[in-house]
Amino acid sequence: EPKGVVLSHTNLLANIQAISRAAMIGRDDSTLSWMPLSHDMGLIGFHMVPLFNHIDQVLMDTELFVRRPARWLETACRYRTSLLCSPNFGYQHYMQSVSVAAGSLDLSHVRLIFNGAEPVSASVCREFAQRLEGTGLNASALYPVYGLAEASLAVSFPEPGSGVQSLSVPLEALSMGNVVMPASRPERCVELVCLGHPVEGCELRVCDQNGRTLSDYSLGHVQIRGDNVSGGYYQCPQCDENAFIDGWLDTGDLGFMSGRGLFVSGRCKDVLFVNGQNWYPQDIEQALQQMPGMEAGKVAVGALRSESNAEDLLLVFIQFRRQLDYFVETARRVQAALAEHAGL
């Protein structure tokens, strides 16, 4: 069920100021966004924030990016914008559709490219930076951030220029309350991206199911409070009751804190229980999309509760346009990848 998030002027102004400071936005900056103004990153992050800072902004039609993704960075090059944004799928869509010739773009003026609004993939960020090596784009410009509508927009940002920092952790460690330590072997692990520290005016904690704050590297519920956080949902008292705990908003995400910042492992409601362990759909999808010939964004993982109601039956959906006979081999490779990556 869709829920309306109520934001006050105080919420918006607090977060706009915090975003401006955290990203070190100055008078020499300018922005480019293809995200619609019906999206909080498009409206608040790349329309209201530039207005607040009195800097130029370029708005690109979303449909144009979908149909002709090359126009995105061509437009950035044309207007020499310094701040760009895209959810993770946008980087995949660009790389899948565009071949960048050496010398065809000059992106040396780009200071930050925000990556948010959905889970951030470290491998996608690395590939994007590698593809654009010849454009003058600094890999440290890639800027993974964390936020949600209930926080107006932003919750945590890394230090500008720090690039994409990640941590590989064992899949079996990603259960509530577990201490999550770096993986000693590359097998059966997932790479999580560091999403920085809370922006000014926003507090963040990681708690267990009883609301007790957990220590660093302990996986739990990500909760927030602050001037930027909504006071509740539109005409939905039950939603407010479910979301707010002693003044803290439960984001619905699971994650852990470290000295480097916040790491989010996934949505609490999306966790699958298979073979006695918790699994996150996006981790399995990410592993399958590394298979040769598998198209980005064409894999979805879900689950169906078993008849015994004891665990979930894993379901993998793949968009496949060739003849069905060819799919048999693809199914075998998917099974092999699941066994190798996660023992499923």
Task: Label each region the model flagged.
Residues L13-S30, D40-S82, S97-A102:
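Conserved AMP-binding/adenylation subdomain of ANL enzymes
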Residues N178-Q223, M257-G259, Y326:
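Conserved beta-loop-beta connector loops within the AMP-binding
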